[in-house]
């Protein structure tokens, strides 16, 4: 035999030498009767091998242990049952009988490898030239059975070990229970197929179950060996690929656990208490001992077990551990109970089942009796009568893998049937081409089979020899002190889970959690722990940020704020200054009083227009000034009214116009007085532009500058309304408001009022210059007091208005400050300049008479005397200077005979 360079990395010489040595050894040591003492042989045209765990693993040094009734005898009999059915079927392998050679693996991979050498004996060239009988004759060897295919094994570790040798001899193998993902590697296990889905499908189903239950933090527990380790590896890989499930810790159960090992495992699992879910890929015995350890440590109800098909719906692992196992979710390839097998197995007796060499041992174990003196049981146990019956005198429940054993045998039979149809068309029995079956060719037919299995489900294989994944999902439940594995769903490439049918330990009404961190509240984002994506800290989206997704927060648009739970944004409420607001009531009240007072003054002046006091006040400029005062009061209503384009236009026009009217008139007055007295110091000629018409022209020229500025403002930046969200963007979004207002910035406001303030300052300067003019000649002093007070008002206005930039009440404070300042300025002018005159007109009409006409010469004399007495004013009381000035003016006036220009109609 030569090496298969393309298939194997090394020459199979070692296996051949081992097999040959084993064959020679057995030939020398065994008699014919002993050869088959531990195997079942049924003759046929085509022989199929079978590997079953008839016995459990023995103690140290002993290959086999106690009998396994269900996993061993039930499955073994299922193969014999299937062989009988096929041999009876006239349409399947007609005129061809199948035989079997069934071996016991004793649940140990090394022992199974030794036993499986029996299957390749016929393929090993025998050299017995050195072997002689006692009489010198050559020995006569029994011709070994030629095995065309093998059914088995059960455990993945056993199948892997056996598959390595069967592939060397091109013997196809179909397993009924091995689910390790490793066996899907078609480059290493190319002659291996199975009628059960691999654990990769099972792992996918378990990941889907964990995800459906909202668990993202789990631990894994595996029995040492291919099945457990491969299953956990597949689960870990799939969970890593899809994300959302993290492994808290992975524990492994040793093949030979030490005393107390299982308690240590439970304690280690408790180190991550939030990972309540435990994914188990463990053998039946390990499952039972884990549950025992959890019970011993009083952990009932803590762990949420997710068991693989090795747990399935078996009673043995949970026997006397019911409370610990309650709520366990287990998975099992979809199966059905085969009624035909039940009838077959119940009819088995010692008399009709002699082909099963282990049936007598099963009989003793099943009925608790002893068969004669050669039985294996103790002598004090009752003797078997042979009249016992299965299911009548003992409990019976069909083992879960019986269906798959039958399907595996039928898969081999259908492959042989199709092969016979192609290679031996019309031939009865085996034709020469099938006298020696080519294993590689048979493998092709196996992978191509497609039939309805014993449970009515399709049996097929993919390119790797795997069956499709179909699983039933169970939950171990306790109801009224009775226990059951209840079907709660199924998995066929996707999960179908009846969550409402699930029941948990201690009657928990909600699904128990197995998460590293609890879900964040609405409005909080996850800040994951580095290296552990399923663990996180919750951080609230602060300020104007809202939760976009579970990992991030984003800032709301300028016109929006987070909603109550910060999962989205909502429009910020829009506000404006309402008429009923305290911030509006006070300015409006002051403005109304001012308008009433101004109207009263205007009416009084109009009514007494030709009286000396009104004429002496300068009627034309007085009406201009009163108009400005009226506008200063009126602007309050425009500033409080709801903004729109028209209101904003009026605000721009009248915001500075009232002040401009007032201070333009006052400036013209003070300038006239100043020029008259300055001119009087130099000559007796009257200065220019002191007539009423000239004064009006000057006043309206000054006002036109303001109007021109407003016009330019209209052109450059047409009036419109805006919603200012930054003005009241408070730290607390709940208090944020959008302010509906005209688009008048602080800079625009300064520019609008700046010209009026310039007029006010200039007027104040003239008032200071004319402060020494005799009060009998002019209004310089009242104007001066008015301007001083007005300056104080506006100096107070500036810090209040511009110091509220960061205040939540900015709009209210600024509007109220501006309107009240303008009303106060108007009130000062009205009160100091006109209320005394109105008082005289109304209450002292006798004083409203003309005392004398003032000539410009008198003004010149007054100005000259004023200049001379300025120096004396530093050393003498003001009263004396004033008296002297007045006496001089009286004398001068009475002695003058010169013609003079009368100013009685022109206020100085």
Curated annotation (Swiss-Prot):
PROSITE patterns in the record: G_PROTEIN_RECEP_F3_1, G_PROTEIN_RECEP_F3_2, G_PROTEIN_RECEP_F3_3, G_PROTEIN_RECEP_F3_4
Pfam families assigned to the protein according to its UniProt record, in alphabetical order: 7tm_3 (PF00003), ANF_receptor (PF01094), NCD3G (PF07562)
Side of membrane Cytoplasmic, spans: 609-620, 669-695, 769-781, 844-908
Cross-link (Glycyl lysine isopeptide (Lys-Gly) (interchain with G-Cter in SUMO1)): 882
Secretion signal span: 1-33
Record-annotated membrane-spanning stretches: 584-608, 621-641, 648-668, 696-716, 747-768, 782-803, 819-843
Topology relative to the membrane: Multi-pass membrane protein
Family matches, as InterPro entries: ANF_lig-bd_rcpt, GPCR_3, GPCR_3_9-Cys_dom, GPCR_3_9-Cys_sf, GPCR_3_C, GPCR_3_CS, GPCR_3_mGluR8, GPCR_3_mtglu_rcpt
One GO CC term, this protein: plasma membrane
Keywords of this entry: Cell membrane, Disulfide bond, G-protein coupled receptor, Glycoprotein, Isopeptide bond, Membrane, Receptor, Sensory transduction, Signal, Transducer, Transmembrane, Transmembrane helix, Ubl conjugation
Chief location category: membrane
Xref: SUPFAM superfamilies: Periplasmic binding protein-like I
Gene Ontology MF: a single term: group III metabotropic glutamate receptor activity
Keyword check for Cell inner membrane: no
SS bond partners: 64-106, 246-534, 369-384, 424-431, 516-535, 520-538, 541-553, 556-569
Subcellular location: Cell membrane
UniProt similarity note: Belongs to the G-protein coupled receptor 3 family.
UniProt function note: G-protein coupled receptor for glutamate. Ligand binding causes a conformation change that triggers signaling via guanine nucleotide-binding proteins (G proteins) and modulates the activity of down-stream effectors, such as adenylate cyclase. Signaling inhibits adenylate cyclase activity.
Protein name stated in the entry: Metabotropic glutamate receptor 8
Record organism: Homo sapiens (Human)
